[in-house]
């Protein structure tokens, strides 16, 4: 693509426009940065800089200066937004560089930006791209042991064991070799680093493939950056997992096939055969690594026969590819060879054909494949695939990907089958697959999608450039926007990295459990936490006396399995630690004690305080004596975070039935800003009860009193201890981003506002502020914006504004903050009239302000109320991982938007005129703990978010 410098009309007036826009832009930026005393001062500054800019740039041809016109996007923008201003500057600079570089190439060589597919021309930039992303991944790498499958891979790679089906033998051998080459780092870090290398190589291969397809470097760079900075790809490239290697083999297969086509089209059959054999080798290795790449192999075969239909009749030419493919399958021999080894995951069944095939083909998961095939469910899953893509890529990149898909089907059918077919088949298979890792299973589709991005950018801009002076400008503008969109992902998606997302959370959790487990105890664990526990035991040698057991479903309800396993283990005379938190007290088991986020059923009664407790002597309501407590994070908490305090107590006398304890968080203004209630379950000795109370938004900074009381008692609550409320280091999510700097002496800037209308006939306004010490939120209930008394702020061009307006969302909409930085933004179904048996889809929308590494379940109920409007006559419950399992909260990063669809049905017993309501909660899939709803108005009525106010139709026959 070539951007002509002097292709635009250069009339005497038009040539002043870029300088005028630049001057106006600078005047606005200067005014908003330093402030203006009034409107006329801003007008004077704008006129002065506008005239100066127009005069200054008019000396150059319009073909050189027109990119400054892009800045008009911010000149006309209706509010102060420094981030948008910087994006406009970035697009302008990129457009200017594109024009200048194109002019220099044209002036010196008379060539376009196309390059030949020579190996040096492609390999050196590809190596640079790969090394750049390797550096990015190393700097953002997870520092050590991880949870769930990642933890398992770190163990079995260190031991040369066998992973869960399909086994991943090639991955394990390569990761183990990587450990041997890096003896100075921990095994866990080495496996994480192997993912970084595989991810960086995949990005480099994508660059080469995109250059082969387009003949241009820039689309290749953009495709590589788009993939390397995609949310899930970045996450997988900085943690131990099999997906980075899957991406590498997908990229290598696509590269080899595109390279093969170049030779076949050129008529070089010998080169074509060699490259086809290379593709077959990559296919063999890919299938050895992960059987899901079979779908890419099938697409590749169709592509080959489209390129060379005569291959169907040339059996001799298939000898080399078949041999190469078989060679790629040789790593599968690892499984039977390790069948008898005394390592994790090994089984003698792997040395038998049935056991080998069952493991390699992962037949235990066959019930999940093509699970969502019913039309209604499949349609919902396809909608979710759109959400999956917006979860990964900037919207401008997605637009050009769609454009590339359309253009390639019009112009290049074989390439359309290869790239478009790969994207489509993996999207459809992922849409029908029942598994909570859809965002990861789509990785081969992401590789194909960025190649479509490269094709779409190259083809569309080349087509525009054919229109001469009227096309080169738009082509440059589109290229600049897409370039900035791709590189901006590096900034926007940093929270997806292993360092920011996972960090040391798995080690912290596992070390706490191992440190708190009594000698000879058993830890019953979810898979998520079992693997880091095993790693610390088997690789680092911690607490070999503790038996860590994975609790898997056994046909009964999962909760029943947990309860039975806990009782059986306790009956055998061993203390039991469980990562499962029962929903009700367990009869026949002692009162549990907290161990981190888990609980311990001890064999012996506690007689003294654990280490780290503060001694106390506090009587509460003549019912319990508090003898000590431990406050987590005593240096302070921010609004939205949990205050975690463990209280050691004993009953004064026998406890009354159904008595409970509570903790209240009270601010300096005497207002209650958080609470947690727990049943009072006492044992023979000291009882330990852990309270987790989340602070509501709007909690004022300063002293926070932690009070304890007995439920149902008229005796006042007692002060247990105090802590400090500080500003948050993380910006809250806001639907309506603004930038309003106050003109008073403070450094406060309003960065966003949100209205909530979830409660009937009620409204709430959230104002989100940033200051030097962090972020805080103010909350105003049932108030009009005009009634707020706020100091003037700096508006557009820095002009003071004294009248505050918050128009967006003032009449409708939802904004309910939850724990972990999650915000519920709808939807509700008010006013519906339904018939018995009717099914409706309730779409729930969530946003996240920060990375989340807990797995939350979205629970939606449709409830038919009794005539009293309180009790339930019937209900339909639908619990699932968000987005029908496609986008778990474990994968959410800062700024994530996730839509979760839930189909609920009106019970056949519903009566005409019956009132219907809905309920939404989120709870931890591992601990059963409900995620806090940080709206005291909602919690005062019910412990859930109300989803609808509807009725059953009265015209039922």
Features from the language model and the residues they span:
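Transmembrane-helix signature of polytopic, membrane-embedded enzymes
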Residues: 57-71, 206-229, 248, 266-270, ...
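Transmembrane-helix motifs of polytopic, lipid-linked glycan transferases
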Residues: 50-58, 193-214, 252-256, 451-455
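Transmembrane-lumen/periplasm boundary regions of multi-pass, lipid-linked membrane glycan transferases
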Residues: 243, 294, 301-411
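Signature aromatic-anchored transmembrane alpha helix within multi-pass, membrane-resident enzymes
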Residues: 18-22, 409-412, 455-492
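Aromatic- and kink-enriched transmembrane "portal" helix at the membrane-lumen/periplasm boundary
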Residues: 27-41, 72-84, 172, 184-192, ...
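Membrane-interface alpha helices of multi-pass inner-membrane proteins
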Residues: 70-80, 156-159, 223-228, 251, ...
């Amino acid at each position: 693509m070539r951007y002509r410098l002097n292709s635009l009309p250069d009339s005497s007036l038009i040539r002043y426009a870029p300088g005028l826009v630049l001057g106006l832009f600078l005047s606005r930026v200067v005014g908003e940065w330093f402030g203006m005393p009034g409107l006329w001062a801003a007008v004077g500054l704008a006129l002065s800089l506008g005239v100066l800019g127009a005069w200054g740039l008019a000396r150059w041809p319009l073909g050189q200066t027109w990119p400054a016109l892009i800045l008009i996007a911010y000149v006309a923008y209706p509010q102060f937004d420094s981030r948008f201003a910087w994006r406009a500057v970035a697009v302008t600079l990129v457009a200017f560089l594109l024009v200048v570089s194109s002019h220099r190439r044209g002036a010196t060589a008379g060539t376009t930006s196309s390059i030949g597919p020579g190996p040096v021309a492609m390999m050196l930039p590809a190596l640079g791209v790969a090394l750049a992303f390797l550096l990015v991944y190393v700097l953002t790498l997870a520092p050590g042991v991880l949870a769930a499958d990642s933890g398992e891979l770190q163990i079995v790679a260190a031991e040369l064991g066998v992973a869960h089906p399909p086994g991943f033998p090639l991955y394990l051998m390569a990761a183990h070799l990587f450990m041997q080459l890096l003896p100075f780092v921990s095994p866990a870090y080495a496996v994480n680093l192997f993912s970084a290398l595989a991810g960086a190589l995949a990005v480099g291969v994508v660059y080469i493939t995109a250059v082969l397809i387009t003949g241009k470097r820039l689309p290749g760079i953009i495709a590589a950056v788009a993939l390397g900075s995609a949310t899930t790809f970045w996450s997988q490239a900085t943690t131990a997992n099999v997906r980075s290697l899957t991406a590498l083999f997908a990229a290598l297969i696509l590269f080899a096939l595109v390279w093969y086509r170049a030779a076949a089209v050129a008529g070089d059959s010998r080169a074509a055969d060699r490259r086809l054999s290379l593709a077959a080798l990559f296919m063999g290795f890919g299938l050895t690594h992960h059987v899901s790449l079979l779908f890419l192999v099938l697409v590749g075969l169709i592509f080959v026969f489209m390129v060379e239909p005569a291959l169907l009749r040339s059996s001799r030419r298939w000898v080399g590819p078949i041999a190469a493919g078989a060679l790629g399958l040789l790593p599968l021999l690892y499984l039977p060879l390790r069948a008898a080894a005394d390592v994790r995951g090994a089984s003698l069944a792997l040395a038998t054909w049935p056991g080998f095939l069952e493991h390699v083909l992962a037949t235990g998961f066959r019930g999940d494949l093509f699970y969502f095939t019913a039309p209604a469910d499949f349609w919902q899953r396809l909608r979710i695939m759109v959400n999956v893509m917006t979860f990964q890529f900037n919207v401008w990149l997605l637009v050009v990907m769609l454009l590339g898909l359309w253009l390639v089907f019009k112009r290049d059918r074989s390439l359309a089958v290869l790239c478009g077919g790969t994207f489509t088949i993996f999207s459809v298979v992922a849409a029908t697959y029942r598994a909570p890792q859809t965002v990861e299973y789509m990785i081969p589709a992401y590789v194909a999608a960025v190649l479509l991005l490269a094709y779409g950018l190259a083809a569309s801009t080349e087509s525009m450039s054919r229109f001469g002076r009227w096309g080169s400008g738009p082509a440059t503008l589109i290229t600049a926007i897409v370039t900035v969109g791709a590189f901006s992902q590096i900034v926007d998606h940093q929270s997806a990295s292993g360092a920011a997302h996972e960090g040391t959370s798995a080690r912290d959790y596992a070390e706490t459990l191992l440190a708190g487990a009594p000698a000879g105890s058993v830890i019953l664990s979810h898979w998520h936490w079992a693997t880091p526990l095993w790693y610390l035991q088997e690789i680092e040698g911690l607490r070999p006396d503790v038996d860590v057991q994975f609790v898997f479903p056994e046909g009964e309800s999962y909760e029943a399995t947990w309860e039975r396993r806990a009782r059986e283990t306790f009956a055998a005379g061993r203390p039991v630690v469980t990562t499962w938190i029962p929903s009700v007290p367990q009869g026949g088991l002692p009162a549990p004690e907290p161990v981190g986020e888990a609980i311990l059923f001890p064999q012996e009664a506690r007689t003294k305080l654990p280490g780290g407790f503060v001694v106390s002597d506090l009587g509460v309501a003549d019912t319990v004596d508090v003898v000590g407590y431990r406050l987590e994070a005593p240096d302070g908490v921010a609004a939205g975070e949990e205050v975690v305090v463990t209280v050691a107590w004993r009953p004064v006398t026998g406890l009354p039935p159904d008595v409970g304890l509570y903790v209240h968080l009270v601010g300096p203004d005497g207002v209650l800003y958080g609470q947690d209630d727990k049943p009072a379950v006492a044992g023979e000795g000291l009882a330990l009860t852990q309270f987790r109370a989340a602070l509501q938004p709007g909690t004022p900074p300063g002293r926070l009193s932690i009070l304890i009381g007995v439920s149902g008692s008229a005796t006042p609550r007692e002060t247990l201890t105090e802590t400090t409320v500080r500003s948050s280091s993380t910006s809250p999510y806001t639907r309506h981003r603004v930038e309003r700097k106050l003109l008073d002496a403070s450094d406060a800037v309003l960065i966003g506002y949100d209205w909530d209308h979830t409660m009937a006939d009620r409204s709430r306004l959230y104002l989100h502020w940033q200051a030097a010490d962090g972020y805080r939120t103010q909350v105003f209930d049932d108030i009009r914006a005009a009634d707020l008394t706020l100091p003037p702020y700096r508006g557009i061009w820095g002009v003071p504004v004294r009248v505050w307006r918050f128009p967006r969302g003032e009449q409708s909409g939802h904004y309910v903050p939850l724990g972990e930085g999650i915000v519920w933004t709808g939807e509700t179904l008010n006013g519906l009239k339904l018939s018995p048996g009717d099914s409706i889809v309730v779409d729930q929308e969530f946003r996240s302000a920060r990375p989340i590494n807990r797995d939350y379940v979205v629970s939606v109920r449709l409830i038919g109320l009794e005539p009293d409007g309180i009790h339930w006559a019937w209900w339909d419950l639908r619990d699932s991982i968000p987005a029908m399992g496609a986008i778990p909260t474990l994968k959410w990063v800062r700024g994530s938007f996730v839509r979760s669809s839930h189909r609920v049905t009106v019970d056949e017993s519903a009566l005409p005129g019956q009132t219907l309501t809905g309920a939404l909660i989120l709870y931890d899939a591992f601990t059963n703990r409900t995620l806090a709803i940080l709206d005291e108005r909602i919690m005062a009525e019910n412990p859930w978010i109300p989803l609808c106010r509807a009725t059953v139709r009265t015209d039922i026959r």
